[in-house]
Amino acid sequence: MKSSGPVERLLRALGRRDSSRATSRPRKAEPHSFREKVFRKKTPVCAVCKVTIDGTGVSCRVCKVATHRKCEAKVTSSCQALPPAELRRSTAPVRRIEHLGSTKSLNHSKQRSTLPRSFSLDPLMERRWDLDLTYVTERILAAAFPARPDEQRHRGHLRELAHVLQSKHRDKYLLFNLSEKRHDLTRLNPKVQDFGWPELHAPPLDKLCSICKAMETWLSADPQHVVVLYCKGSKGKLGVIVSAYMHYSKISAGADQALATLTMRKFCEDKVATELQPSQRRYVSYFSGLLSGSIRMNSSPLFLHYVFVPVLPAFEPNTGFQPFLKIYQSMQLVYTSGVYRIAGPGPQQLCISLEPALLLKGDVMVTCYHKGGQGTDRTLVFRVQFHTCTIHGSRLTFPKDQLDEAWADERFPFQASVEFVFSSSPEKVKGNTPRNDPSVSVDYNTTEPAVRWDSYENFNQHHEDSVDGALAHTRGPLDGSPYAQVQRVPRQTPPAPSPELPPPPMLSVSSDSGHSSTLTTEHTAESPGRPPPTAAERQELDRLLGGCGVASAGRGAGRETAILDDEEQPSVGGGLHLGMYSGHRPGLSRRCSCRQGFREPCGVPNGSYYRPEGTLERRRPPYGGYEGHPQGYAEASVEKRRLCRSLSEGPYPYAPELGKPANGDFGYRPAGYREVVILEDPGVPALCSCPACEEKLALPTAALYGLRLEREAAEGWSSEVGKPLLHPVRPGHPLPLLVPACGHHHAPMPDYGCLKPPKVGEEGHEGCSYAVCSEGRYGHSGYPALVTYGYGGAVPSYCPAYGRAPHSCGSPSEGRGYPSPGAHSPRAGSVSPGSPPYLQPRKLGYEISAEDGRDKYPLSGHLASTGPLASTESPEPSWRDGSSGHSTLPRSPRDPQCSASSELSGPSTPLHTSSPVQGKESNRRQDTTRSPSLAPTQRLSPGEALPSVVQGVAEKTPELLTSSRPEQLDPSPFSQTSAPGSPNGWPQERSPGGHTNSASPRSPVPTTLPGLRHAPWQGPRGTSDSPDGSPLTPVPTQMPWLVGSPEPPQSSPTPAFPLATSYDANGPIQPPLPEKRHLPGSGQQPSPPARSTNQHVTFASPLPDVTQPPEHPLQENQSNVKFVQDTSKFWYKPHLSRDQAIALLKDKDPGAFLIRDSHSFQGAYGLALKVATPPPSAQPWKGDPSEQLVRHFLIETGPKGVKIKGCPTEPYFGSLSALVSQHSISPISLPCCLRIPSKDPLEETPEAPVPTNMSTAADLLRQGAACSVLYLTSVETESLTGPQAVAKASSAALSCSPVPVPAIVHFKVSAQGITLTDNQRKLFFRRHYPVNSITFSSTDPQDRRWTNPDGATSKIFGFVAKKPGSPWENVCHLFAELDPDQPASAIVTFITKVLLGQRK
């Protein structure tokens, strides 16, 4: 082959006049000739320790290698003279190299050059390359593409690559895609497995193990099989996989494998060593350590308390250093800190305190960003990934060379490090509390886009080369830019190449690892930028982006002070970058954090992936060497019975699709490690039906993989090859594949006496007469999908009412009739997108559920007809309700709490922020046990003084309202104690408002499971116990279906399922809202500490915990009573939305007010006040003028108490009651004085008439319903529930071979649950699923049909129930319609509205 000019000159410079392989030899190595040198302009990286050389170092006169003086003796590489300067400085592209990438070039002997390895990665050959195909070994190929190739050319190269592979290996190759999914990869290649993860990141250990196992399975199946590793961008992914497989294969390697191991090591050193990130090296070391057995696993829980970050004043000289942290667990966002600002020079270290402590388990990634001066951009400071079970001390330190991005950043000092402080309990670390310098302030306005963006939520959710639709867009920023990237799909002309050059190519040479080839192309002219989008295009973008992309007139301009952002950011005119939160669309119900907006419920994509934040981040040329350790492996077993599993399993961090199995034994099972120790109920948080949000609602699960080692049995691992240990992780047990840290060290706790208390940043608004709580009717979408509880404004909930007499809602700390966090059944009561549209959101009224879950107070009709839906408020985050130990076990069937009735998908980006309340957080993160002694012993009248412990929240010290702990009932006293007015001897639970809640003596949920809250059934009452003495409608106490035998009363034949029945006989009601946390009251005793949630938010409590011993329920607390008459139950409505507050107050007199929980700032409150005239700055109002007179103010919480934010004249108050009392005397900064109400404003709203032909849910459930259906199959969904579980089961049933044979079964729904009877006894005789085990029911979200033998199709539906014997795993039972008169929608509606709704 005739060489081109530059190549020929390069060969001549290296002393190889003849390019023949037989005669070519590198010149003799010479020793280095070092001399001292001061590096001023450009500081190089030390060739030994890979750390930037600051100041003086040594440099070789010949080869120019630089190192520290102390590292001079450690230099191992030989001295090689550099090529001619013209080649070192040449950046012109080589025009062509004939037949590169073709079969001929791969087999040509001259193509395998023997360049020394020291030149194989030299950046001197900076030419544009399109494909680097290397034979790592004879059976492992590596195909690398640049990060941003021209799409049209890239497709051509993929076709050429497929042709080369097909011609040389036929169908004997398996392609592993390590980047984003692509349609053309699947079309062009016979077998493709998708194992993608973000660029420059380390893959989780389970994915690493899965890839190695899949490679071994494929290569061992046939001697002619080969593996092709495909990636785009950085070749670090190739290095990670090749290194991991090198360690993996050495376990069973013989003498014949030694050469393959050597060539893999050479490949890593030659081709990818300098592109490996520190976290990638660390995970390779984890993997090798796990394989070698040199790991000492840490099985204790790990709570993160503090993170110490170095202060980098030179990071951005103009704005200073403004860091904030994001913490991910299994690539799911679990914590976002506030933005720290350093006023002046002085502090060298910043302490970021997490209160309460954050429980971490498994793969953890911590990213530190710097918030730009504009407030709309952010820059990555460092990123570090580690695994928790490798941590064995209280302190974990990462020096600069172990931090991604920072290791090559000159602004990051060499001596700086990042430090994490852990403990084994959520209690505060004993000793000196670290404090920040007084010059450090914190901004907790984490709703800003630059802080809230999560760059990983949408990775691989769509194919990279997807061409469906006229527009392709990324749903969210990738690199911290404030705008989503929206691009036209090229139609006729090829797209312009990316203006940013790809990374420097590697010389495609491998001296001892086989063939190599590189495709090179000439630089093409850059095409001019596209014109700005037209109006039609903007309208289309607005539809695609859910109202997040087009600026419109927002109503935020009329507010008095910009206390809350209301998600209004200036949009960028022109171009395709559209402002994310630039305005509001009138028709939008809320914004979803996935930035997708409205989308047809066309199904859930297979797989939930995250988008790499590093895709568009600046990248520096990496330095450093490859470190590998010869150690053992952990295998990700493949199981036949799980090949049919769908991949729409919620937030599996990297669950790839199944691909095409090569044979019956090969297929990729989704990654087995899932975080299951902290199980949360997904609930139905918000009105968003986009697939990304729906997938986020599912809970992860865990699986243990067996190790193929001789010592496995002794270590508790399965020694049977290929058989996975699929055990759910139990509390207190270590997660699988937990391996020790590499490159970081542990040290004892430091002395933090030198640190100083933090200064809480405040946003002061001078000269304001109004401090508006501008949360907006739209709210924001940064709330955790896994833990929030749904409440939709106009979407009603269904909660059977036993009595309808109006009654007061009680004080703020009472137990309301809302879903209890611990026993909340995931997605219970919700209707999948495939269900009939029962709801007309804008035509429905509202009503507020009282504390017993029975008495409803419908709001005025304006609530549903004016303005955006009230449900646009973001859901109440459950960290207010119980942030630890939540279980996915179903709620008790006797818990008449409400559940939302429509498919409300939660946000796909769970934002877990720290609130402004920092400091004196109550540290007893414990479960509380309700004692039955309080209610039976004393009844309090409305005007009677309450115990201080119970009334502590009625006094409204807001910091105490942090999170309600999961509670467990002690069943033993219930059988012996009977409270006055409690029928059937059921005990009664005292609530602060003077009410008594009857609790069921029989809890069907086990009380021994940690973190499980037993929500008591609010039993019937025949006496009045409302504050105003109004009688409650009595309910018959004869309810054999609730207290009798498991079988329902056999009074009459079971009717069919009603087709058009309204299951709520008591008028429209408000959707369910979670409880506020209150302190363990009198008569309650703390149970062992529960685990923290996956989500995290910090609060503070200026008062100590008030946990009284159970022996003294009331006596010790009377002295602390401060209020003779508590009026907070009249004005504190924590669960009201903004629109509901407006509807209640717009017709009131000036001075009428309500206080509710802020839905934009956790821990804060919103004050809605009716004023006489609108403020002068208010803009013209197009709606009801009376609505403009309801103004909103933000009440912030802090260590000093509560105050109205935005006005410096406002003082702090110890409680909300004190604030209200003072402002009722003097308005201070408010427009007028507050008028304390004397009665509940909800009672003044007339009740909606009840049609006489409606059947109550209780009557329907008592009677039951049944019909015949086709039973298809049952599919294990692990911890997955909700519509994703039904979609997964449907996919499994429709894709399994052979197709399951359906059986006709009798399907009966009663108060006890669901009973299936196989009349023909083909599969079983009878199966019963108790109501407490059923968590969800819906039709197939993708509306797929079951094809019967006669060709007719039937709708598929199913219900999700707990797997017997396992508190964490679920099973989805799938059915198809049989009787046309009994459609699936009617069955699902009956289960959802009646069965699941009744038990709440």
UniProtKB/Swiss-Prot annotation:
PTM annotation: Ubiquitinated following sequestration in cytoplasmic aggregates with SQSTM1, leading to proteasomal degradation.
Polar residues bias spans: 433-444, 898-917, 929-940, 1082-1098
Domain annotation C2 tensin-type: ranges: 299-425
Disrupted-gene phenotype: Glomerular defects during postnatal nephrogenesis including severe glomerular basement membrane (GBM) thickening, effacement of podocyte foot processes, and mesangial expansion and sclerosis. Ectopic expression of laminin LAMA2 in the GBM followed by the accumulation of immature laminin components. Decreased adhesion of podocytes to the GBM.
Residue numbers carrying Phosphotyrosine: 456, 483
Residues modified to Phosphothreonine: 91, 474, 909, 977, 1173
Membrane topology: Peripheral membrane protein
Domain Phosphatase tensin-type: residue ranges: 122-294
Positions of Phorbol-ester/DAG-type zinc fingers: 31-79
Keywords annotated in UniProt: Cell junction, Cell membrane, Cytoplasm, Hydrolase, Lipid-binding, Membrane, Metal-binding, Methylation, Phosphoprotein, Protein phosphatase, SH2 domain, Ubl conjugation, Zinc, Zinc-finger
Record-linked Gene3D superfamilies: 2.60.40.1110, 3.30.60.20, Pleckstrin-homology domain (PH domain)/Phosphotyrosine-binding domain (PTB), Protein tyrosine phosphatase superfamily, SH2 domain
Reaction(s) this enzyme catalyzes, per UniProt: O-phospho-L-tyrosyl-[protein] + H2O = L-tyrosyl-[protein] + phosphate
Pfam families per record: C1_1, PTB, PTEN_C2, SH2
Designated name of the protein: Tensin-2
Species per Swiss-Prot/TrEMBL record: Mus musculus
Native organism taxonomy: Eukaryota, Metazoa, Chordata, Craniata, Vertebrata
